[in-house]
Amino acid sequence: MKFSPSLLRGTLIKRYKRFFADVELEDGTIVTAHCPNTGAMSGCAEPGYTVFLSESTNPKRKLKYTWELAQTFDGHFIGINTHNANKLVAEALDNKVLKEFSDITRWKAEVTPPTANSRFDFALERENTQHQGIIEYMEVKSVTLAENSKGFFPDAVTQRGAKHCLELARLAESGIKTSLLFCVQHTAIESVQVAEYIDPTYAESVKKAADAGVSLLAASCIIDEQKILLNQTLPLIL
């Protein structure tokens, strides 16, 4: 996913009320940008970080700028916009980036299975040996919480996330293939694990999903101020 037009560079002054970030642009102008991340953003929003903003030309928007990237003091990039995770996965599916999904023939975003109560990020189709299309479902989570080289999810309690895991487990138990993909938008992260110390209920739901046969995996991203690309799988520690 390439950023076009180019992002604007600035310095983070502060993030507040979850959805707002004050940023000083390179020319000294101070602007308020939309923060498209409702999580705790621990370690992602330190005052003084270099940040990168996209600029909207839509006159109806209340905030002209959206916070897309942050760069830590030691140079690591973080994808702030959680909405980009699904875009990155869609692009990776099209380009056969991950071998686990290289035989996907078609996909559709935002789908509610006929027997489920939750909408999932993707319905995927593979062909079996009889060349019949088999549908499976995937949920995507964006990971940005880093401690040393380890990534953790979630960074805040997520009842919705736990519900999704249990729904994936129920589908898996009924014979439908399901997967949970952690999209790592932080270049310092080398492995991923569930943050049981933040949300033990979510951690338990992930374990139940794994026991039910849900496929769990994590994937890293290449990130710089021009682009974000899903790259390769990372170790996932349960």
Swiss-Prot record:
Matches recorded under CDD domains: SfsA-like_bacterial
Annotated InterPro entries: SfsA, SfsA_C, SfsA_N
Family: Belongs to the SfsA family.
GO MF: DNA binding
Domain of life: Bacteria
HAMAP family: SfsA
NCBIfam families, per database record: sfsA
Pfam families named among the record's database cross-references: SfsA, SfsA_N
Protein name (Swiss-Prot/TrEMBL): Sugar fermentation stimulation protein homolog
